[in-house]
Regions:
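C-terminal motif of bacterial Sec signal peptides marking the signal peptidase cleavage site
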Residues: 16-19
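An extracytoplasmic/periplasmic, membrane-proximal ligand-sensing/linker region
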Residues: 68, 208-228, 238-251, 316, ...
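Ligand-binding pocket segment of bilobal, Venus flytrap-like solute-binding proteins
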Residues: 113, 119-123, 197-283
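Short, well-ordered beta-strand elements
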Residues: 57, 66-80, 98-103, 194-198, ...
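Bacterial signal peptide processing site
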Residues: 21-23
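A conserved helix-loop-strand patch within extracytoplasmic ligand-binding domains
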Residues: 142-200
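Immediate post-signal peptide segment of exported/extracytoplasmic ligand-binding proteins
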Residues: 54-73, 186-194, 367-370, 378-385
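A bilobed periplasmic-binding-protein/Venus flytrap-type ligand-binding module shared by bacterial periplasmic
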Residues: 155-167, 300-313, 336-338
Length: 385
């Protein structure tokens, strides 16, 4: 589907297909944008998640001189998102001339802020974790996807250390957690004999997948584990990581949720088989492949999302985010750098900014994300750091 005009404002009709039930609902959203040449409207389709998301391509533009409004980022409370924020904010500030800020918080409230326009950009929208809210935001015309964030990630609710499975080689499935001898491995003094699961934090999309949301009762209930598992909210991503690291250091049993690629999973040897993902029903066995109905997480599709008001205010940012390419190599390198320098700064935000500057100085991968004029602005700024 193509649209063309000659430097005039046109009504751009975007058709959103939302697969939120057995039928596909088509919603038309009208948005006025300035288009300078013929561009294509593409749809990114994820078969496993069954969410169609349209991406509008824009001509690569350079902002005009003059005052520009502040761009507000969603400060999701985990490292990969905050590092991406820091890199993107530096480019937007030094390259495009916008002041930036971020509102920190968890997935659910920050996405509501994005829909309302309190937040302009969120660097990590995890699907299927946020399927319901995402589909509603797209359907209402409040948000659009403008690029791919991380590479496709994995996540699982039921991970155990390989050293536990080596001691109990027949423990290889969530069904085994229904047996007294296996759930006793992960029981704690206050869990009444149930296996303790260190799960997803309150306010994160994955929490609803595990314990239930508007779409379903959650993995624990639908896998028949309610009488066998005691769910524990670690409170923060840092506390979850500390619990996992502590168990591995002591060679203690632990049943936990996590995701990757991340520095923690790399350090603990996930790629080398030192972490076991207990067998679960395949995503294809669940309605709409949604894990909330009692199956494993499919591969996560992670999007960069923009509030639609920013289309008018800063259309030149859309090509930048469409070209964003935060590979696993970039991610793990930056997370490692952050871990090394975090204690040297007075605040986490300062440490994330220093991590971003280090990445931008040492890597040239990002040069292709921006026009030459913007690249020149950023290069000058980096030389002053």
């Amino acid at each position: 589907m193509k649209y063309a005009s000659l430097m005039t404002l046109i009504g751009l009709s975007i058709v959103f297909a939302i697969a939120c039930s057995s039928e596909t609902e088509i919603v038309e959203v009208i948005k006025e944008v300035e288009v300078i040449k013929e561009v294509e409207v593409e749809k990114i389709v994820t078969d496993e998640v069954k969410v169609e998301v349209p991406v509008v391509e824009y001509v690569e533009l350079v902002p005009e001189e003059g005052p520009k409004r502040e761009i507000v980022f969603g400060g999701l409370n985990w490292n990969s998102a905050l590092i991406q924020n820091a890199v993107a904010r530096y480019i937007v500030e030094k390259g495009y001339g916008h002041e930036t800020s971020q509102i920190e918080g968890a997935t659910v409230p920050l996405f509501q802020g994005l829909r309302k326009g309190d937040i302009d950009i969120t660097m990590e929208i995890w699907l299927p974790n946020q399927n319901d809210a995402w589909n509603e935001g797209i359907k209402s015309g409040e948000v659009i996807p403008v690029g791919k964030s991380l590479e496709d990630n994995w996540q699982s609710t039921f991970l155990i250390p390989a050293y536990v499975q080596e001691e109990y080689p027949e423990l290889d499935s969530v069904e085994d957690l229904k047996e007294e001898k296996y759930k006793a491995i992960f029981a704690e003094p206050d869990s009444n004999g149930k296996a303790v699961l260190y799960g997803c934090m309150s306010g994160w999309g994955c929490r609803g997948v595990q314990t239930g949301n508007d779409s379903g009762d959650g993995q624990i209930v639908n896998m028949g584990l309610s009488d066998h598992i005691e769910f524990r909210d670690p409170g923060t991503a840092g506390a979850l990581a500390a619990a996992i690291e502590g168990a591995f250091t002591k060679k203690d049993p632990i049943l936990f949720y996590y995701w990757g690629p991340t520095a923690l999973m790399s350090d603990l040897g996930y790629a080398d088989g030192k972490i076991v993902d207990l067998e679960q029903p395949a995503p294809s066995e669940c309605k709409d492949n949604d894990p909330v109905h009692g199956c494993a997480f499919p591969a996560a599709e992670i999007m960069i999302a923009m509030n639609t008001e920013l289309i008018d205010d800063a259309p030149y940012l859309i090509p930048f985010f469409q070209k964003w390419d935060w590979s696993a190599k970039n991610q793990l390198l930056a997370e490692g750098n952050y871990a090394e320098i975090a204690d040297d700064y007075g605040s986490a935000e300062e440490a994330f900014e220093a991590t971003a500057i280090s990445y931008l100085k040492e890597s040239s991968n990002w040069h292709s994300w921006v026009p030459e004029e913007i690249l020149a602005n950023i290069t000058v700024a980096l030389e002053r750091e």
